[in-house]
Design a protein with these regions (language model features):
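Residues in the recognition helix of alpha-helical DNA-binding motifs
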Residues: 17, 31, 42-43, 72
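Short alpha-helical elements of helix-turn-helix
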Residues: 12, 37, 52-56
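Short alpha-helical DNA-recognition segment
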Residues: 22-42
Length: 72
């Protein structure tokens, strides 16, 4: 997999987990306190590479482990 494919897969999985948890993009952004809802959208579309801190903050709010976001 190349970088773009990894980011798109990560984004699709993030969107699925966010929806499962019942958060909107804005709601997740507010709960993490780290970014705006449109930034969550960019992550979900694979348009940006989130920092490790952002990923960990999202995982904490959604109460998930990394393997839910990236499945090899």
């Amino acid at each position: 997999m190349n970088k773009d494919e990894i980011l798109k897969e990560f984004g699709r999985n993030l969107k699925a987990e966010r929806n499962r948890a019942g958060y909107s993009q804005d709601g997740l952004a507010l709960k993490t306190g780290i970014c705006a809802g449109k930034h969550i959208g960019k992550i979900e579309r694979g348009e940006t590479n989130p920092s490790l801190y952002t990923i960990i903050s999202i995982m904490d709010v959604l109460n998930i482990s990394f393997d839910k976001l990236y499945k090899k």
